[in-house]
Each structure stands twice: as C-alpha cells, then as structure tokens.
Amino acid sequence: MALPLLNYAPKSQNVRVEGYEIGSEEKPVVFTTENILSSSDMDNLIEAAYRQIFFHAFKWDREKVLESQLRNGQITVRDFVRGLLLSNTFRNSFYEKNSNYRFVEHCVQKILGRDVYSEREKIAWSIVVATKGYQGLIDDLLNSDEYLNNFGYDTVPYQRRRNLPGREAGELPFNIKSPRYDAYHRRQLGFPQIVWQNEVRRFIPQEKKLTAGNPMNFLGMARSINPAANTIPKVSAQNINIEASVPRR
C-alpha cells in the first residue's frame, strides 16, 4: 500500500502571483496545439518540449514514434511529455545520475515549471519515488491539479514567470540553475577540469623579436654563469707558529 503524499505548505513564489504587466517579448512563448496552423508550428512545439525536458536533444535522443503520434493527433502534448519523461535518455541522464531529492527537484522544475517550495516538499515527493517508483512520480506530477490547471493536455510546460518587471535580472533558467548531474557524479566523470597538453609559448610581435647581434641574446647566457668566488681562508692567531714563520738568518 502506497503512503499518502506528505503535506507541505506552498510559499508565495513568483509563480503563485498573478501577472499584471503588459505583454511583451519577455513573457514566455506558450506552445500549444490549440493554435497550430502549419507543420512548422508543430515542429516548434516538439522542439520546445525537447528543450523543456532534455534541454538539448541529440539526434539519437529523439523519440520518432512519439513525434509521429503527436503529429497525427493520436496522443496529446501531455502524453508526449510523459513519453519523454519515461524515455531511456531522461532516465539515464537524470534518474540514475542523481539522488531521489535531486531527481525530484528536476522533475518539479521540468513538469510543474517552478522550483520546489521547501525541503518538506522535496522529502514528500522523494517518498513517492521510494514507494511508487520512477514512473509513479512522473504520473503523480502529470495528474496533479497544479499541472492540469496551468498546462492542461495541450500545452508544453515552461518555466513560469521567470522575468519580472522592476528587476534587472529575472530567475535563472532551470538548465543553468540545476545542472544535469550533481557534484558527486561530476567528480566521477572528471569535470570540471582543465587538461593542457600543448607547450605554452609567449607571443612576441615581429618588431620586438631580437635580431642577430643584439646584446639581449646573451642575457640568458650571462645569467647562467655562476663564477666561483676566490675566498681567503681565515686563520686564527692561536694557530700561527711564529718560530716556523720567521726565516733563519
């Protein structure tokens, strides 16, 4: 029997405050199947879903079957997002490379479009991972009232209210704020590190290069000379033999 979700109190984040600003280019672009007018619009929607879930999808990461089903109207955007979340790429990149707490943070950001409210919410969803498993957490987040009220079945999730008026910089994008791997796995993979295998040479302009006969060419040789000093040994007065030192007449 699965444990009920642990209660946690939401806090007044930006996503819980209704926006009153005039629409501008800073507002996030909403991709939904309700205003698809051409095949290029569907391509943009699919790319937006890949960016939201994977941040960057390579050619071998793409789910061609799910894309075809979405284009033909066999599945909704919510089903397409669910398929990406349950794919091997997402599982290998986020679930297997992070702890349950870190994985919960990634899922809340990517699915609900916000940060976790507190450590208590992080613990609550991590209990779901422990009791219902990896797929159980994905289903519970997609079936939650918060997801359905904000994105429904036809809208790609996005980071809600990242840019705010009156501030020079808004909230950081989730892909920068929360890297794919935590610090432990980044150390396992050996980065960040700098490996420099080439010889470091100093660039000298042509007009400053030394020509033949320039005394500066011999500066290195002069510095390398270490002449031995001719030191005079010190003799104590008590060790001087006066009788032996005075010549005989």
From Swiss-Prot:
Phenotype seen when the gene is deleted: Decreased growth rate, decreased energy transfer to photosystem II. Decreased accumulation of phycocyanin (PC), loss of the phycobilisome supercomplex and major phycobiliproteins ApcE and allophycocyanin. A double cpcG1/cpcG2 deletion has even less PC, but grows slightly better than this single mutant. Unable to perform state 2 to state 1 transitions (i.e. cannot transfer energy to PSII).
Main location: membrane
GO annotation, cellular component aspect: phycobilisome; plasma membrane-derived thylakoid membrane
Gene3D superfamilies attached to this UniProt entry: Phycobilisome linker domain (1.10.3130.20)
Annotated compartments: Cellular thylakoid membrane
Membrane topology type: Peripheral membrane protein
Domain PBS-linker: 11-188
Keywords: Antenna complex, Membrane, Phycobilisome, Thylakoid
Function of the molecule: Rod-core linker protein required for attachment of rods with the core of the major allophycocyanins in phycobilisomes, plays a major role in light harvesting. Although able to transfer energy to both photosystems, this is predominantly a PSII antenna. Involved in state transitions.
Record note on quaternary structure: Part of the phycobilisome, a hemidiscoidal structure that is composed of two distinct substructures: a core complex and a number of rods radiating from the core. This protein is part of a conventional PBS rod (called CpcG-PBS) with on average 3 stacked phycocyanin hexamers (PC, CpcA and CpcB). Linker CpcG connects the PC stack to the thylakoid, the hexamers are linked by 1 copy of CpcC1, 1 copy of CpcC2 and the stack is terminated by a single copy of CpcD. Ferredoxin--NADP reductase (petH) is also part of the complex.
Family in the record: Belongs to the phycobilisome linker protein family.
Protein known as: Phycobilisome rod-core linker polypeptide CpcG
UniProt source species: Synechocystis sp. (strain ATCC 27184 / PCC 6803 / Kazusa)
Gene: cpcG
